[in-house]
Amino acid sequence: MSAIYNFCAGPAMLPAAVMKKAQQELLDWNGQGVSVMEISHRSKEFIALTQQAESDLRELMQIPTNYHVLFMHGGGRGQFSAVVNNFLGNHGRALYLVSGQWSSAALAEAQKLVGEAQIDSLNIVEKHNGLNAVVLPDLHKIDADYRYVHYCPNETVDGIEIFDELDSPWPIVADLSSTIMSREIDVSRYGLIYAGAQKNIGPSGLSIVIVRDDMLKLPSLPQSSIMDYRLAVEHDSMFNTPPTFAWYLAAEVFAWLKSTGGISSIAKINQQKAQMLYQCIDGNAFYRNGVVAANRSQMNVTFQLVNEALDGEFLKQAQIAGLVALKGHRIVGGMRASLYNAMPLDGIVALVKFMNEFAAKHS
């Protein structure tokens, strides 16, 4: 069977080595004679797995000791509400920076929960010569007392990534769902990081929260116990039964990433993958991209065919060639190739070859 390269934005492809190991261990994990899905989450064997997973993630991301690592339910959207409910008690206010669809969704959820009076927002994307560009504001010039400023460094739908570090007088809350572990960051700059698992961590149903000690002292609102960060810390992310299989796969992904050289190593490969694809797009008048070079996403490359009438044929022929899930998000259309950590360089080589041949045939 020919190789299949899955460019889905999420749930995304997992490393082949991880999938093969999970397949081998499915019916007999760790010599238990049963699947990891079938054992108690409070057994010593599973507790050892969770401890190793946290240790590996801390090592990979160089997470300081004054941060807690939580494995929670709900994905990214679950964290939209959890952040508000955990930090905005007693009429606290927050600022949301809007750079695309997902930061807009986080803003809408926050305003729904506490009202617009407690939530301010700034649109940080402008048009530069017809292309989307991020312009980060000088937050130190804003006279306000916010509990936190929220932003999304990588917008999967819009193909926009913010590489510059955000400088803020207030704690930074970041949605890293689509960029976590794809490149190195300084965790100590953040008050809280959250990420849905289904892009660079594992399957859907799990989210990772990395929260600084002092953030847990902020007044909270009444909320579901399973989304309470303080309870999650107190109970080692096991206030109730966690998504054990997703946790197991996340642990395997962390171990795989360590074995490949860690984040510094995968970041170089990710940069190479993105450069190859953007060079193909820019070097051919058949395709176009709507983002300035400085803000083009390395994880989610969006592009359009100049002749949109060929979109259907492009997707059909790509599927035949083993290049799947290239259709752009329904909101923006066009094409999108997601290049998360698990996507091998060979996948980009195959995609670029196909795109060049398709353009030559239909120009």
Swiss-Prot record:
Main location: cytoplasm
Protein biosynthesis found in the keyword field: no
A GO term for molecular function: pyridoxal phosphate binding
NCBIfam families associated with the record: PRK05355.1, serC_1
Keyword Ribonucleoprotein included in the entry's annotation: no
Gene3D superfamilies: Aspartate Aminotransferase, domain 1 (3.90.1150.10), Type I PLP-dependent aspartate aminotransferase-like (Major domain) (3.40.640.10)
Name of this protein: Phosphoserine aminotransferase
Known cofactor(s): pyridoxal 5'-phosphate
InterPro entries: Aminotrans_V_dom, Aminotrans_V_PyrdxlP_BS, Pser_aminoTfrase, PyrdxlP-dep_Trfase, PyrdxlP-dep_Trfase_major, PyrdxlP-dep_Trfase_small
GO cellular component: cytoplasm
EC number: 2.6.1.52
Catalytic activity from the UniProt record: O-phospho-L-serine + 2-oxoglutarate = 3-phosphooxypyruvate + L-glutamate; 4-(phosphooxy)-L-threonine + 2-oxoglutarate = (R)-3-hydroxy-2-oxo-4-phosphooxybutanoate + L-glutamate
Summary of subunit composition and partner proteins: Homodimer.
Pathway(s): Amino-acid biosynthesis; L-serine biosynthesis; L-serine from 3-phospho-D-glycerate: step 2/3; Cofactor biosynthesis; pyridoxine 5'-phosphate biosynthesis; pyridoxine 5'-phosphate from D-erythrose 4-phosphate: step 3/5
Binding annotation for L-glutamate: R42
Residues where pyridoxal 5'-phosphate binds: G76, R77, W102, T156, D175, Q198, N240, T241
Organism: Shewanella baltica (strain OS185)
